[in-house]
Amino acid sequence: MRVVVVGTRGSALALAQTRFVVERLKETWPETEFKIRTIKTRGDQGASPREEAIFVKEIQEALLSREIDIAVHSLKDLPTESPRGLKIASVPRRQDPRDVFLGKAAKRLKDLPPGAVVGTSSVRRKAQILALRPDLVVRDLRGNVDTRLAALGNGEYDGIVLAAAGLIRLDLRNRIDEFLDPGEVLPAPGQGALALEVREGDDLAEELCYALHHPPSYHRVRAERAFLRGLGAGCLAPVGALAHVEEDGTLRLEGVLLTPDGKSFIRAEIEGDVSEAEELGLDLARDVLEQGGREILAQIR
């Protein structure tokens, strides 16, 4: 029996995601043995959240050195360009991409009183929350999901904003008070999606992964990530994007670029054929840059 090693971070969420993937792989390839190997990343060791690839670099290095054969990532953690020698082999069916609100007393973001404290780990969420509710106080909230839920329970925050997908994958959907409307708070490009990464030229690993590939999810995140790449903003700027694929093959993409304080933002949308997902993302980025996005990025830098 052939053995395939699947690498992942060691957090509860990363392991839940990877176990889900491995179970699907086992169903499709029962003659193959899949082993999970956890890898500690710089992000797990407290690296600055303003660095790129802090949750993936060590896993990618293990892939390149052949310690593992497949890497399972949260797609939003991946830089928009793959390292030399690696490729994304598969994007499985995407989980809910939206952000969600969990409150201490208030059960909706709009019901929080002025001056209430909201916790989030993301400059994108912070900027969009402040754009909606400039009367709120938004503070950093980091750590794993359990740590963030404990901070809410301890009364350190009046509410917190997280990704829906993580809570759902951890069977914590019942903790969600409100799904935030993407018309007001756009998620991160690729949020809710997983990426299965392999070495270029490893046809076996690529074939194994491709069995889980979900083309509509792939086209959606491809457009969103192209928008991010076209802005040249990196994965840590206040950028949101969300694409939808209609039954007739039309892809609709909406994107936003904000200043960190949420006082200025440019939001735009585009649509076209799903086969042009990447071009649509790049075109939308050019549109946002021409509408004043360059000035916003200059402020951020």
Swiss-Prot record:
It catalyses: 4 porphobilinogen + H2O = hydroxymethylbilane + 4 NH4(+). It is an enzyme of class 2 (transferase). Its cofactor is dipyrromethane. GO terms for cellular component: cytoplasm. Signal peptide: none annotated. Disulfide bonds: none annotated. The modification S-(dipyrrolylmethanemethyl)cysteine is found at residue 235. Binds 1 dipyrromethane group covalently. It comes from the Bacteria. One of its GO terms (biological process) is protoporphyrinogen IX biosynthetic process. Its EC number is 2.5.1.61. Keywords: Porphyrin biosynthesis, Transferase. Pathway: Porphyrin-containing compound metabolism; protoporphyrin-IX biosynthesis; coproporphyrinogen-III from 5-aminolevulinate: step 2/4. Pfam families: Porphobil_deam, Porphobil_deamC. One of its GO terms (molecular function) is hydroxymethylbilane synthase activity. Belongs to the HMBS family. The porphobilinogen subunits are added to the dipyrromethane group. Monomer. Tetrapolymerization of the monopyrrole PBG into the hydroxymethylbilane pre-uroporphyrinogen in several discrete steps. HAMAP family: Porphobil_deam. This is Porphobilinogen deaminase. It comes from Thermus thermophilus (strain ATCC 27634 / DSM 579 / HB8).
